[in-house]
Curated annotation (Swiss-Prot):
Class of this enzyme: transferase
Major place of residence: cytoplasm
Name of encoding gene: aat
Example GO BP: protein catabolic process
EC number: 2.3.2.6
Protein name: Leucyl/phenylalanyl-tRNA--protein transferase
Source organism of the structure: Neisseria meningitidis serogroup C / serotype 2a (strain ATCC 700532 / DSM 15464 / FAM18)
GO molecular function, one term: leucyl-tRNA--protein transferase activity
Record key words, sorted: Acyltransferase, Cytoplasm, Transferase
Length: 241
């Protein structure tokens, strides 16, 4: 199989439909992970999956797992935790720390992390540009001081939030962050959350599958529409939970 090489001076991607027709979803490989290439990738439903031998591998997945915010489902067991737990959820409180924790997280059936230092640097650049955001869940320690317990990060373009990775240092911490983040993002105008892959974890939150063509069409419409208000840096209330 011939792998498309992405030109360093051109951020355009081949049509993901061809990659999906081959069943592997590999859109192309590049030597760079520039902010401009990342943004163009997300706009087209493509994301960087891993780094191997100096090459970044870019993929599209279809059907695509997404969450429509107004159809968010909070599992009953998590609802109880949300009511009874003394936690705080913030947005953009410690982006670099969240990404570092995601990179260090041990995951089933994975020998290592895909979030190599090059990825961390690239997403930190997107954060500085106002595109990448983190949500953090804080728990009080034995002295009553709140400490980071879990969270996740992703990329926001227009009215789409592209989820990337989660971590939890304490049970349910990343789930709490996510359950609070979705209504918050919806209040600012986010209409679609990209979960990339179909997982049991996201299905518990109400994810659904879109044919890739439908997903790409929604991206074309929603990426061009600005939010009602910038995400900023603040505490996030778990409204309606």
């Amino acid at each position: 199989m011939r792998i498309p090489l992405l030109a360093p001076d051109n951020y355009a991607f081949p049509d993901p439909a061809y990659a999906l027709a081959r069943c592997d979803g590999l859109v192309g490989v590049s030597r760079d992970l520039d902010a401009g290439r990342l943004l163009e990738a997300y706009r087209n439903g493509v994301f960087p999956w891993f780094l191997r031998d100096g090459w970044f591998f870019w993929y599209a997945v279809g059907p695509r797992a997404v969450i429509v915010p107004e159809r968010l489902h909070v599992p009953r067991s998590l609802e109880k935790t949300l009511r009874n737990c003394s936690y705080r959820v913030t947005v953009n409180g410690c982006f670099a720390e969240v990404v570092a924790h995601c990179a260090a997280a041990v995951r089933p059936n994975q020998d290592g992390t895909w979030i190599a230092p090059e990825f961390q640097t690239a997403y930190l650049k997107l954060h500085e540009m106002g595109y990448a955001h983190s949500f953090e869940c804080h728990y009080p320690d034995e002295n009553g001081k709140t400490r980071l317990a879990g969270g996740f990060y992703g990329v926001q373009i227009g009215r789409v939030f592209y989820g990337e990775s989660m971590f939890a240092l304490q049970p349910d911490a990343s789930k709490i962050a996510f359950a609070c983040a979705v209504p918050f993002l919806a209040s600012l105008g986010v209409e679609l959350i990209d979960c990339q892959q179909d997982t049991g974890h996201m299905r518990r939150f109400g994810s659904e599958l879109l044919p890739f063509a439908d997903f790409a069409e929604r991206l074309r419409m929603l990426n061009a529409v600005p939010l009602k208000e910038e995400i900023g840096r603040r505490e996030v209330a778990c409204k309606g939970l």
